Amino acid sequence: MTLKDPFNRPVSNLRVSLTPKCNLSCIYCHREGENDPKASLSAAEIAEVLRVAAGFGIRSVKFTGGEPMLRPDLTEIIRTVPAGMESSLTTNGTLLAGLAADIKQAGLRRVNVSIDSLNPETYKKITGTDVLSDVLEGINAALKTGLTPVKLNMVVLKGINDHEIDDFLAYVRGNRDLVLQLIELMNFNDCDHHGDLNGLETSLASRSKQIVTRRMHHRKKYCLDGAEVEVVRPLHNTEFCAYCNRLRLTSDGKLKPCLLRTDNHVDIRGKSGKELEDLFIEAVRRREPFYT
């Protein structure tokens, strides 16, 4: 059975926040909407959610945070992913070097690494920490262990790191296992560092040898002389909503039908079996495009 919302959008992807905790203090972080953190779901509770999700035809799960690698039971959680469901993880990379082999062995398919600067001073300004070398070591470990393709998530911050895009292109160029994702800043509080990415996309298009539209997200992938780049633009983007195929689960057990809303969550904590299945159906019923 495949779940479809009232707008005929199938749900095939689940994002699971494992913890609101993080070891960085990024200046723009919205913590996946978790501003009032409570106790996180246990590994057993997450396993039951994944079992039900698989029964509804959800074929991929991405573990997020906070920083998911702060969970001491991370490998246990990864091992509970049902057969046939692809698992990936978004991390800040600071702990990745020490865990890459273990999470790969547990069954994780690949990772996204959040890295907003290749300059140590700028990185520290953005994250509040001086650990860029650890992140770069983690990326290398992910490549070595086959957690690929490794997608590098760079949030574009006007006046801080927007001049580094060519540096990132040089970093990924020539390595087919690295993909650069340039992400529009979520401008919730009129942040001074939000910038319009129209000019950036125009520039990428003019420099590209090939432009491919990804089927899953209907997102363009720009191929620039050995470098693959995607631009992620969730704000005021009708296509982002029209092709959305995911549900989100907060670390304390609430299904989020929409990234940009906080008024339609479905609390599933402590539920299992048929009751949990019904709540999944209700969460999908509440899905509607934020931008139309």
Please tell me what each predicted stretch does:
Residues N13-S17, H30, K62, K151, ...:
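Conserved beta-strand segments that form the floor/walls of ligand-binding pockets within enzyme
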Residues M1-V16, S25-I27, G55-S60, R219-T238, ...:
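N-terminal [4Fe-4S]-dependent radical SAM core
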Residues D5-A44, L259:
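Canonical Radical SAM [4Fe-4S] cluster-binding loop centered on the CxxxCxxC motif
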Residues E34-P37, N119-I126, D190-C191, V266-D267:
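A short acidic, helix-capping loop that chelates divalent metal ions and anchors anionic groups
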Residues A43-F63, E67-L178, L182:
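Radical SAM/AdoMet-radical enzyme domain recognition
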Residues F188-T292:
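Accessory C-terminal segments flanking Radical SAM cores
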Residues N35, V155-I160, M186-C191:
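Short histidine/acidic/glycine/proline-rich micro-motifs that form metal-
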Residues M1-N13, K21-S25, L197-V212:
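Flexible, acidic/Gly-rich N-terminal and inter-domain linker regions that tether
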